[in-house]
Amino acid sequence: MSRLGALGGSRAGLGLLLGTAAGLGFLCVLYSQRWKRTQRHGRSHSLPNSLDYAQASERGRQVTQFRAIPGEAGDAAILPSLSQEGQEKVLDRLDFVLTSLMALRREVEELQRSLQGLAGEIVGEVRSHIEENQRVARRRRFPFARERSDSTGSSSVYFTASSGAALTDAESEGGYTTANAESDYERDSDKESGDAEDEVSCETVRMGRKDSLDLDVEAASSPAAAALEEDDSSGREDVQLVLLQADELHQGSKQDKREGFQLLLNNKLAYGSRQDFLWRLARAYSDMSDLTEEESGKKSYALNGKEEAEAALKKGDESAACHLWYAVLCGQLAEHEGISKRIQSGFSFKEHVDKAIELQPEDPRGHFLLGRWCYQVSHLNWLEKKTATALFESPLSATVQDALQSFLKAEELQPGFSKAGRVYISKCYRELGKNSEARKWMKLAQELPDVTNEDSAFQKDLEELEVILG
């Protein structure tokens, strides 16, 4: 039994030892597997991160590659498949589009600036027009009162003759307020005395008129009157000599035109009330505007000449020369003004040229000026046409054909009237597609000498026509 007990105890100890060893081994295996799973999980996280970075880098490189090629999204997919020549053509087209857009932007900015300046001019003109109307209304509402005068040449003679003494404030117009504040009895008394004074004064005026008529008859028959008539006739001869000399100097050289201008200025005080003198002075101002090189001088001469032409027109509306030179000076002044005033001057120019042609249809100058106006109007730009339509009820309208007819009429009335006119005829025919006629008139223009500054300025146009027409 003891031996069996010892054997059983030893077996139990061995089983316990084996169980402990197995448990430890199981724990080791379990820990080892868990550690391996942890390591494997860490690698799996690091590997996708590296792959994602590589893929992102690749995508970035692809995007960079696509973005390096200009164009839209579709172009990015197509351009890599194009040849080098095709890609260059596409890029050239894109450059052209960008250049066109930049030019369009500059034009829009310039148009905005022009419209802003035009708006300012319109506002200024409207404001000045309103102020002028207000001044006229104030003048009509508050007319100027007559002032008292003690001189014998004024209406105070009437009161002196009736009363025989100087008037008090209550008896004169200046004392109307004081007299008006008196009683009814006093006003009635004044009315009766005033009626008596009126009767006396009327008789005085009638006697004075009779005496003056008698004096006029005696003066007309006196030797002094005959001397005055002789002086008037000699004065008329003098002014005719001045006008004739001014006409001759106007047809001469530049120095002659300057002398003619000075001649008229020196005689303005003596003959400035005559219409035929004033329009010649306006013509001389036009000559000086052409001869002057400075911009301010040109504008000043044109402005002064326009004022003289206006003064001449106020003395009569039936002078073709007055209308003609007023139109010329309007055109010269318009060259130094803004777009709004230029268009307004264009309407005034056309109006007075038409009037000059109506009064003197055989004068080639009017037809030449009308042709030049039609030619310039037919070449107005878009902004000028829109401005004319916005500011005026009837916009400016003319064609190259209208201009050609007027130039041909001037040439018909006086062949070789103007070298510039023949150049205009050649240009009109060329624009109408009649090159043979244009070539003919170009050669005719080359035969004429330069008479005016406009003729000299058209020399460049003649050279261009010769190159184009051959």
UniProtKB/Swiss-Prot annotation:
Segments on the Cytoplasmic face: 36-470
Alphabetical keyword list: Apoptosis, Coiled coil, Cytoplasm, Cytoskeleton, Differentiation, Membrane, Microtubule, Mitochondrion, Mitochondrion outer membrane, Nucleus, Phosphoprotein, Transmembrane, Transmembrane helix
GO BP terms in the entry: apoptotic process; cell differentiation; intracellular calcium ion homeostasis
Post-translational modification: Phosphorylation at Thr-160 of the FFAT motif activates interaction with MOSPD2, VAPA and VAPB.
Biased composition (Basic and acidic residues): 184-194
Database matches in Gene3D superfamilies: Tetratricopeptide repeat domain
Residues where Phosphothreonine is found: 160
Membrane topology type: Single-pass membrane protein
Transmembrane intervals: 13-35
InterPro entries: RMD1-3_a_helical_rpt, TPR-like_helical_dom_sf
Mitochondrial intermembrane side: 1-12
Role noted for this protein: Involved in cellular calcium homeostasis regulation. May participate in differentiation and apoptosis of keratinocytes. Overexpression induces apoptosis.
Domain notes: The transmembrane region is required for mitochondrial localization.
PANTHER family for the chain: REGULATOR OF MICROTUBULE DYNAMICS PROTEIN (PTHR16056), REGULATOR OF MICROTUBULE DYNAMICS PROTEIN 3 (PTHR16056:SF18)
Similarity remark: Belongs to the RMDN family.
Entry protein name: Regulator of microtubule dynamics protein 3
Organism of derivation: Mus musculus
Lineage, broadest ranks: Eukaryota, Metazoa, Chordata, Craniata, Vertebrata
